[in-house]
Amino acid sequence: MLRKPKILYYSNGQTQKEKAIEKAAKRLGADFISISETDCTQTVGYLAKVKGFPVHKTSILENISAVCQDVMILCYFPNTRLDLLLASIRNGETPAVDLKAILTPQNCIWTFSQLYQELLEEHLSLFSNQE
């Protein structure tokens, strides 16, 4: 069974960029799921609507980790559509997102905030090594 590709996107308040990425998703035949600040405590699997990932009930005492940049998660993208999306980012047709990931069995159990932290650390490590 083939699953429909999805883009999960946290805009960090960048509404124009969010609209452009949503438009790119539609152009590629992918669903677009906007992630809100309150979604950041949910698992990536739940946000991507993967079976077996229930909603995480957050107490008012639970610390919501701040996600301070936009984040894109690509789910169920076949290589051909992934190549098209990356090409549209390279040619400026779709806005670039520094922190992006592909949904995997490993990261679907993480909360969105945990995945953000991992992506941020990788991004900072990659670019600090280029100096």
Q: Could you describe each region identified by the protein language model?
A:
Residues 12-13, 77, 107:
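Structured loop/turn residues at secondary-structure junctions
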Residues 4, 69, 96-97:
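A general structural motif
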Residues 61-92:
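Mid-chain, well-packed structural core segment of small domains
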Residues 63-71, 116-117, 127-131:
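Short, surface-exposed, charge-dense and proline/glycine-enriched linear segments
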Residues 1-53:
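N-terminal, charge-rich interaction modules
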Residues 36-65, 112, 116-119:
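Intrinsic, low-complexity N-terminal interaction/targeting segments
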Residues 17-20, 27-33, 82-129:
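Helix-rich interaction surfaces within compact, conserved domain-sized segments
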